[in-house]
Design a protein with these regions (language model features):
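Flexible glycine/proline-enriched surface loops and loop-helix/loop-strand junctions
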Residues: 58-60, 144-151, 161-163, 245-254
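Short, conserved catalytic-motif segment at the N-terminal edge
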Residues: 2-65, 87
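Active-site helix/loop module of the DD-peptidase/beta-lactamase fold
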Residues: 59, 64-68, 82-124, 142-143, ...
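Short, charged, amphipathic alpha-helices and their helix-cap/turn boundaries
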Residues: 41-44, 127-149, 175-192, 236-241
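Active-site-proximal alpha-helical segments within enzyme catalytic domains
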Residues: 115, 161-168, 252, 256-278, ...
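Short, gly/Ser/Thr-rich active-site loops of penicillin-recognizing serine hydrolases
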Residues: 253, 274, 278, 288, ...
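Active-site Gly/Thr loop motif
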Residues: 206-262, 290-343
Length: 377
């Protein structure tokens, strides 16, 4: 399998892992990037844009990364806090007064960041026509009653989180999340990533290949049991095929419809890996960059069905004796982003063939395992 790009010899096992994914058919097209001590040491891509394997993946190919998008939204919110414009411990209603309705007056901003707001889904059944309409979604969320007491437990806000964070940001800055991200992060870092794809980038978008059951949360529906998880995935109702539509690509869904490649994701998160600054561009203070690694809430996530530990947005290793300064998240289908401040490494894997996992899978794990082995060897 032809792999293009560059890879420092020390990280050759990363290239081997990508080649293996492609050769055994686990991937159709993918990109991988690693920054180490603020230098790009891996920038690779290979395979094809489409399931028919008729168009080769290019250096500037971008693709929808689902919940890896959340990591970009977290960075936007961290920047606002760093500037003193946002307090994570403040009530959401301080910035968004209408949000106080239906028992939400005391919901904190950090509850939104950490899937603890009780708003992992909507009572009203909505699909793509609604969740591509910002005003409709934020109006519904402002009126929604929490499904559990905010701050007392977690359930992954797969789609709703981006609207919640994005509306707080909009009330503070007057900009949409996509606008703020483009101006304050992507432009400053020269990163090819978008929350809402511009017209001139649309021809570069790879075609996502859905998993066998293309419904978000398909495994939950298969159980047939009413639960927080089932209700969360039932509305907003998302299917992988939605990503093929122009409405999806052009909308701003800051928890789910970011488009980019591994180079962009790794470059952006090199900021966190290097304590707030990358290649001479400082986006965060060192104190704020370090704060991401401090656990805010841990427990059994009712939507994901597993034990989790969350810092400010990002996932942390849920071990009581863990002292590693590492955070991560991934997207439905397989994309992933890993940031390790101890080694100052940022790792990203982005692909178009979706597997069933919601926050990454074994393909990205093989990439990250190879990258870490290259650093500690």
């Amino acid at each position: 399998m032809d792999i293009a790009g560059r890879c420092e010899p020390r990280f050759s096992d990363v290239q081997a892992a990508l080649e293996s994914n492609l050769e055994r058919g686990a991937d159709v097209g993918a990109s991988v990037s690693v920054t180490y001590q603020d230098e790009t040491v891996v920038d690779l891509y290979g395979g094809h844009l489409d399931e028919a394997r008729s168009q080769p993946w290019q250096t500037d190919t971008i693709v929808n990364v689902y919940s890896t998008t959340k990591t970009m939204s977290f960075l936007c919110m961290l920047m606002l806090a760093d500037r003193g414009e946002l307090d994570f411990d403040a009530n959401v209603a301080t910035y968004w007064p209408e949000f106080a309705a239906n028992g939400k007056a005391d919901v904190k901003v950090w509850h939104l960041m950490n899937h603890a707001a009780g708003l992992s889904g909507l009572d009203e059944q909505v699909g793509i026509e609604t969740y591509t309409d910002w005003q409709k979604m934020t109006t519904l969320l402002a009126a929604q009653a929490p499904w559990w007491e905010p701050g007392t437990g977690v359930a992954y806000h797969a789609v709703t989180q981006g609207f919640l964070l994005g509306e707080v940001l909009r009330r503070i800055t007057g900009q949409t999340m996509g606008e703020f991200f483009a101006q304050e992060i992507a432009a400053k870092l020269d990163a090819d990533f978008y929350i809402g794809v511009p017209d001139d980038a649309l021809p570069r978008v790879a075609h996502l290949i859905p998993p066998t059951d293309s419904r978000l949360g398909a495994n939950v529906f298969a159980n047939g049991e009413p639960s927080i998880a089932a209700r969360s995935y039932a509305s907003p109702r998302v299917a992988a095929e939605d990503s093929w539509t122009l409405a999806w690509k052009k909308a701003e869904i800051p928890a789910a419809n970011g488009h980019g490649n591994a180079r962009a994701v790794a470059k952006i998160h090199a900021v966190l890996a290097n304590y707030g600054e990358s290649n001479g561009v400082r986006l965060l203070s060192e104190e704020t960059a370090r704060s991401v690694m401090v656990p805010r809430i841990s427990g059994f996530d009712k939507t994901l069905g597993m034990q989790v530990s969350y810092g400010l947005g990002f996932g942390l290793i849920p071990a009581e004796n863990n002292r590693r300064r590492l955070c991560f998240w991934g997207g439905w289908g397989g994309s992933s982003a890993i940031i390790d401040q101890d080694h100052r490494i940022s790792i990203s894997y982005v692909m178009n063939k979706m597997h069933g996992g919601l926050t990454g899978d074994e393909r990205g794990y093989a990439i990250s395992k190879a990258a870490f082995a290259s650093v500690v060897s």
